[in-house]
């Protein structure tokens, strides 16, 4: 445990192309092995692809996709007297955004399209329409929390 308390959060810089912090977070989630310019190329390409398919602002499409993927509840393990319970808890807004981006990127990497740009673009489009694996992940998380609602009084 650090003695000085938690490290201060560094402010996110707005994205230079779209002027959005969400796009910056998405670039950072795509990033592998420090290749930031490649990650930016993938994200910008995916957003252009989404613009071509929908004809609307890609940042609005991304926000709509994230709203469909963000979880409101999740389960956390809590050990009580030798038994481990899955206790449903509400998700903080910053964590829900982080989880949504993580799921979008993770499930877009598992898709079958040829390039990562197409995969990410199609996962964003599917999520904005309420489809796709990342939306299913959110539904599964909510179902798990609902199923363990009886243990909600163990919340901390």
Swiss-Prot record:
GO CC terms: small ribosomal subunit
CDD domains, alphabetized: uS7_Bacteria
Domain of life: Bacteria
GO MF annotation, one: structural constituent of ribosome
GO biological process, one term: translation
Keywords on record: Ribonucleoprotein, Ribosomal protein, RNA-binding, rRNA-binding, tRNA-binding
Keyword tRNA-binding on entry: yes
Function, as annotated: One of the primary rRNA binding proteins, it binds directly to 16S rRNA where it nucleates assembly of the head domain of the 30S subunit. Is located at the subunit interface close to the decoding center, probably blocks exit of the E-site tRNA.
Assigned protein family: Belongs to the universal ribosomal protein uS7 family.
Summary of subunit composition and partner proteins: Part of the 30S ribosomal subunit. Contacts proteins S9 and S11.
Identification of the protein by name: Small ribosomal subunit protein uS7
Gene name tied to this protein: rpsG
């Amino acid at each position: 445990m650090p003695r000085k308390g938690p490290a201060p959060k560094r402010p996110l810089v707005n994205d230079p192309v779209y002027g959005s912090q969400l796009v910056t977070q998405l670039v950072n989630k795509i990033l592998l092995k420090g290749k930031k310019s490649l990650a930016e190329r993938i994200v910008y390409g995916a957003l252009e692809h989404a613009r071509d398919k929908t004809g609307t602002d890609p940042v609005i499409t991304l926000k709509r996709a994230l709203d469909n993927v963000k979880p409101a509840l999740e389960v956390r393990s809590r050990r009580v007297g030798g038994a481990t319970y899955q206790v449903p808890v509400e998700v903080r807004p910053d964590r829900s955004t982080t989880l949504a981006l993580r799921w979008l990127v993770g499930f877009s990497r598992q898709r079958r399209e040829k390039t990562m740009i197409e995969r990410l673009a199609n996962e964003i489009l599917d999520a904005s329409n309420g489809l796709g694996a990342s939306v299913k992940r959110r539904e599964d998380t909510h179902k798990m929390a609902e199923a363990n609602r009886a243990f909600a009084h163990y919340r901390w």
